[in-house]
Amino acid sequence: KGGDEIRYPASITKIMTLLLAVENCSLKEDVVFTETGTRDISWDSGNIGMQVGEVMSMRACLYALVIRSANEVAAQIAEHVGGTEQHFVDMMNERAAQIGCTNTHFVNASGLPDPDHYSTAHDMALIMREGLKNKKFRRIIGATDYTIKPTNMNSEPRVLHTHHPMLAPESSYHYDGCIGGKTGYTSEAGNTLVTAAEKNGTTYITVTMKAADLAVASTDSTALFNYGYQNFTKAQVNGGEVSVPNGVTVDNLTVQENSQNGNTVDDYYYNDYLLGSVEVPEATPTPEPAVDALSDTSGGNTDQADQNEKADTVG
């Protein structure tokens, strides 16, 4: 309902900030806090009290970004990854367009209020879906707890615990199968909530915006999840799967082909309602006959990126 209505996203903006960070840097990098980050610290704004000159790992920054919704950390991540905040914002908007967002425009990395900072429930779901393809993103967006070790300017650990009602185990709104999400709130945006759940191999994403409170947002999200799992099944299509209403077959769907980020994507519709999108696999070229297979000694090489990824695990 109202999936394409333009609204203020508040802190669910940080989903895009997280995605760009895990795509563009190592979690082991040190982030040095400058006035860029610390200027966004205020009593009524989510923060962890960072100071100018304080150093923290990118991993710790990202957990603070998601779990505590720390705005000064969002600003510092933007400067660290993009060189400048403005360049990072440009990266956010470019990545949103690549993902397929058509009604989104960011002006900061945190979601603090600005008339020109907006999105839609549909676009935020697309960003979340893209993020869930990344293992680091999934691990961080689904964390319920994290302890930041003492830093060069803070002798005490900072203990973080999620305030996402559907993710927190102790919450009365906890949803069995919830794998992560992000909360948001400003007086202009109301309460915003992005949530992902996975059951029986099927993942659904819900987005609520401008809710009266998190209880309403969580209740609505739970109703959406229950409806999806009770009334939809997976159907095999070219290159993947889409969820279709019970009793509907692939023959009942219409397909619209488009290009996304240089790849061909098929959008599947039922009664003019978009059910899902699947990237069309490229045709496998016919291999050329081997001239001298025994002379190929490259098989023992290991991709350095794979080595880096394996080494970059949560400590």
Residue ranges of each PLM-predicted region?
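Domain-terminus/edge residues, biased toward the C-terminal soluble/receptor-binding domains
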Residues: 101-102, 113-315
